């Protein structure tokens, strides 16, 4: 597939500069980019103690990425349906990179009947009732819990990757990372060249580079419609 130019080999240094800006730039009164705290807020969402539970800290961290989680969804995910979320998270590996998922493993890990897809449907309220979580918010919750496996999808990075909707996003991301063109290695290089001390995943590196690139192109962030 054709990648956005910011992910091409010739622009590794430029992408690294964007990642550095995102994580280090201070705005008025010394306030950082709020999204720079998403990854490691309260120690991160994939640390052993909380890896299999959606916590209030996870949902607070998601709000740092400009997507407030509706109150009914918070109650559902943290309280009334927390056991279901935990059961699904227990079946989704914490130590697996999307780039390492083989073609034979894809359906088991991310296919329509996988625990990851079932968690996505739970987050969206697909099989019960809608509680206000759209695809962007769902992707950010999943990326908080499994940062190495699930990428963020939104109205900036999606179009840059040629995604018209969220239905096929995981397969598209997977194809880009496993086509042998060296994207995983470039993402590692981007993170290393960025000079940031925070150890973020390759997927988060890609997300930040794409998002910053899109914003500088003048792309606008649309609301996360619950549809």
What are these regions (language model features)?
Residues 1-129, 148-227:
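An N-terminal alpha-helical hairpin/helix-loop-helix interaction module that forms a charged
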Residues 139-144:
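Contiguous, well-ordered alpha-helical segments that form the cores/surfaces of helical PPI scaffolds
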């Amino acid at each position: 597939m054709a990648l956005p130019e910011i992910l091409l080999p010739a622009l590794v240094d430029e992408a690294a500069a964007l990642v550095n800006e995102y994580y280090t730039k201070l705005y008025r009164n010394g306030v950082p980019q709020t999204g720079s705290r998403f990854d490691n807020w309260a120690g991160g969402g994939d640390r052993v103690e909380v890896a299999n539970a959606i916590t209030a800290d996870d949902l607070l961290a998601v709000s740092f990425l400009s997507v407030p989680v509706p109150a009914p969804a918070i109650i559902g995910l943290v309280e009334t349906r927390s056991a279901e979320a935990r059961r699904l998270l227990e079946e989704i590996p914490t130590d697996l990179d999307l780039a390492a998922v083989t073609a034979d493993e894809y359906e088991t890990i991310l296919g329509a009947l996988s625990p990851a897809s079932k968690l996505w449907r739970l987050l969206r309220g697909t099989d019960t009732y809608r509680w206000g979580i759209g695809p962007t918010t769902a992707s950010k919750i999943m990326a908080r819990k499994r940062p190495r496996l699930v990428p963020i999808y939104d109205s900036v990075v999606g179009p840059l990757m040629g995604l018209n909707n969220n239905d096929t996003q995981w397969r598209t991301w997977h194809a880009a990372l496993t086509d042998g063109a060296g994207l995983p290695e470039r993402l590692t290089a981007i993170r290393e060249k960025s000079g940031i001390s925070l150890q973020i995943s390759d997927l988060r590196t890609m997300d930040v580079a794409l998002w910053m690139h899109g914003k500088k192109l003048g792309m606008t962030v649309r609301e996360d419609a619950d549809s």
